[in-house]
Amino acid sequence: MEPAGAGREGWDGTMGDDPRQSQMLEAIEDFCDYLILVVGRSDATVRGYRSDLRHMAATIPDLTEFTLPNLRAWLGRAVEEGKSRATLARRTASVKSFSTWAVKNGLISGDEAARLVSPKVTRNLPRVLGEVQAGEFMGSAAADTEDEFRRDSAILELLYATGMRVSELCGLDLGDVDHHRRMVRVLGKGDKERMIPFGKAAADALEQWLEARDRMAKVEDAMFVGVRGGRIDARQIRRIVDRTAQVAGADHLSPHSLRHTAATHLLDGGADLRQVQEMLGHSSLQTTQIYTHVSSQRLLEAFRQAHPRA
């Protein structure tokens, strides 16, 4: 985790000369510390907030100028620059959260940012594999050595079986897996812990990998290691998925697609939405509900292809 107070450098190396800018930057860093230490936000989330707020501070350097007209003008320039609706929505959310915190801490008198309207962002339905495709994909792992093949197969099976995030898989330790109960302990966003079940295919793949692990590993605890023996990272997992997708003929498939696929297949099989929410580690049921739309679309496509009256 990034230490509190980290990253207190100036914007583009120039901010901080003006005392007003220094006050704004200090407030932004205090807010980021609050997000890390009190709210428990992830490093990646806090980096996003910091980036958006420093961008804002380059235009609105003084807390006394943190007003609704100035904020609208700042966002308006982003529109003129052709920024996406997703970027505008994220920047709006960042300044609104900062504003609420600043009011509570007496840095500004009124929460003018609360009146900002966030643009609606159209969420694309995630790419998912069909059940037959998923089976073919799991059987398409390819690697330079037998040990790497066993590792790659275990990674793919576990991602598909559990729907866990890539970052969560990278953080797995040997002690996190209960092989007898076929359960894995995952540390998710905000350091929230959850237990996820997995099936026989993943269990068999893990057993095969663990027989080979000690020949590759140079660290004691990490469940999965890279070619140099250290804990595996997200970039290496991306390469594993890319290589497998190429063999399987599954274009444009990302590691996150396996998470989408797991969730969709659970719902297709009749799993309860809240159970899937818990399994995926979503804080909001609304996030999980997007997979019900995927299942509905798949059902509609199957109907159109198979029903004589479609």
Curated annotation (Swiss-Prot):
* One GO term (biological process): chromosome segregation
A GO cellular component annotated for this chain's UniProt record is: cytoplasm
- Keyword entries, A-Z: Cell cycle, Cell division, Chromosome partition, Cytoplasm, DNA integration, DNA recombination, DNA-binding
Q: Which residues form the Core-binding (CB) domain?
A: 22-103
Report any Pfam family annotated for this entry: Phage_int_SAM_1
* Residues annotated as the enzyme's active site: 165, 189, 256, 259, 282, 291 (o-(3'-phospho-dna)-tyrosine intermediate)
* Subunit record text: Forms a cyclic heterotetrameric complex composed of two molecules of XerC and two molecules of XerD.
Designated name of the protein? Tyrosine recombinase XerC
What organism does the record attribute this protein to?
Answer: Corynebacterium efficiens (strain DSM 44549 / YS-314 / AJ 12310 / JCM 11189 / NBRC 100395)
Organism lineage reads as: Bacteria, Bacillati, Actinomycetota, Actinomycetes, Mycobacteriales
Q: Which gene encodes it?
A: xerC
